[in-house]
Amino acid sequence: HLGEQDEYQPNNRGFDEVFIHGCGGIGQRFAGSQGDVPKNSYFDPTIRHNGKFVKTKGFCTDVFFQEALRWMKNQKDKPFFAYIPTNAPHGPFIAPDSYKALYKDHTKGDANQAFFGMISNIDTNVGLLMKKLEEWDLADNTLLIYSTDNGSAKGSKIFNAGMKGGKGSLNEGGSRVPL
């Protein structure tokens, strides 16, 4: 959400390695979104890697974590800072079928199943990250912070534990996040 202004890009804000989607998010369909890669998708997304577009394979969250893990493995012998802001869960609500299937008997509607599937996919990837930190003997010397940027955009009845409001709201359901 920092736009496409060069001075706000991560490579101009202290990051040595940058692997991001373009302005507006992946898969969003509103005027002005995806100006750099029209019709980009959550599956096999085109990503900007250090200023160059690369076509990737897989679901976007998996792709971001795979690249982060590759980079971390190369840095493991020296201190590093890695920031992995996932695109999901974010509209449009799309998830791999195997993750949506986990919720078919628990909630109605494809979008709800995909929303929860996106979250489960993040959980899987965070678990993989923790496993790799253990494998590389980094877990005991690593601070892992897991947070979010806002409350749910999906509605407060089942997604915000009864808190009033959601994404974009000043109420607790829109602004209460860890840390």
State each model region's role.
Residues L2, M118, N150:
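Active-site loop->helix "elbow" adjoining a glycine-rich segment at hydrolase catalytic centers
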Residues L2-F80, T86-A95, K104-T107, Q113:
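Formylglycine-dependent
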Residues Q5-G14, P92-S98, K131-L179:
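Histidine-centered active-site microenvironments of extracellular/periplasmic hydrolases
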Residues D36-K39, K57-G58, I119-I122, S152-I158:
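Short linear motifs at secondary-structure transitions and domain/linker junctions
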Residues V54-F64, D110-T124, L138, A161-L179:
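A short beta-strand-to-alpha-helix junction
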Residues F65-K73, A101-N141:
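A long, amphipathic alpha-helix that forms part
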Residues A82-Y83, D137:
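Active-site acid/base region of carbohydrate-active enzymes
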Residues Y83-P85, Y146-S147:
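Structural cue for short, hydrophobic secondary-structure segments
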